[in-house]
Amino acid sequence: MEVNVVLSSEEIKRGLKHYRRIAKQDILLAADAEKPDDFRRHAEARRSVYAHLSQLAETRSPQEVVQEALRCYQELPFVTGTSSGEHIEVKGRENALENFFLMVGLEPKVRREVRSQRQALR
């Protein structure tokens, strides 16, 4: 699937660094959350996605980084509609990837197409 990415590798790395910092702050604030363990696990899952994509952005083109993010997104099990305490890590990774897609200006149609290919969790 061909994607058009207008951001440079440096812009992608800067944006991901910002997102990683937010996730780190969330990890540090988790103790004050209503459900501290869930909040921390969600933030850790997001942070790991941002770290993975940042590492890729060091050596790969912006298009390759987006393609990898789309591949990761497609491989996630579909857990939308499950209760809030279930599948925290999957929901955190999904949230991180969707934030990344917004950051790079991915066409919503592309994200929806990939999302429709995801398998439901069994």
PLM features: what roles do these ranges have?
Residues 8-27, 43-46, 60-77, 90:
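Short amphipathic alpha-helical heptad-repeat segments
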Residues 13, 20-23, 27-30, 40, ...:
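Heptad-repeat amphipathic alpha-helical coiled-coil interaction surface used
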Residues 57, 67, 82-84:
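Compositionally biased, intrinsically disordered low-complexity regions enriched
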